[in-house]
Design a protein with these regions (language model features):
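Surface/interface-facing alpha-helical segments and adjacent flexible terminal/loop regions used
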Residues: 1-60, 64-183
Length: 183
């Protein structure tokens, strides 16, 4: 084997390479037909896909808990949510391999996190912060390459929310402050 540590260093790439090698072997006429080469290759590929799905699930949990913490800052569960953010993010970071970056479905991760947070907040009679952007405002690097600064992540999420018309009453849009005239 050319790179004996690839299995340990990057299971996703290893699985893809092994599946391709098995398919190439399976196409050789001189080899026995007793081995179901295509399905063996598919099973090995599924190892890599499973690892990707695990990281996606952990990222969904990380983001969902961030959204809950942001949307319901006074909820009794806020301390628990903060612990969960740290736990899920660390687990995602430990399992993440660089080859996964292009395979992670970032749009689905963000959408699933928003849906999961919304469902959970309803149980507490809370609602999601309105105006969240369609794309995740937290970069993959922020989520996967270092220990997450939870307060910074919460500020970034809050700053990315686009105020809705009902929220605009708390903002002043006039360039000049209004002055009162007295008679």
């Amino acid at each position: 084997m050319d790179r004996p540590s690839l299995y340990d260093d990057d299971i996703v790439t290893w699985a893809e390479e092994q599946a391709a090698a098995l398919r190439a072997l399976g196409s050789r006429a001189e080899l026995s037909n007793a081995v179901d080469w295509e399905n063996v290759a598919e099973e090995i590929e599924s190892v890599g896909r499973s690892q990707v799905r695990t990281v996606e699930s952990l990222l969904v949990q990380t983001l969902a808990h961030l959204l809950k913490r942001l949307s319901a800052p006074d909820a009794p569960a806020r301390g628990h949510w903060r612990d969960e953010i740290a736990t899920f993010q660390l687990s995602a970071r430990v399992r993440y391999e660089p080859a996964m970056r292009q395979r992670l479905n970032w749009a689905r991760i963000w959408q699933d996190a928003k849906e999961r947070a919304e469902q959970s907040l309803r149980m507490y009679d809370d609602t999601m912060l309105p105006g969240l952007p369609p794309d995740c405002p937290l970069s993959p690097e922020l989520l996967l390459e270092s220990i997450l600064d939870i307060d910074d992540a919460l500020l970034r999420l809050a700053g990315s929310a686009i105020p809705t018309p009902s929220d605009r009453s708390q903002f002043t849009f006039d360039a000049k402050p209004k002055t009162r005239t007295t008679r």
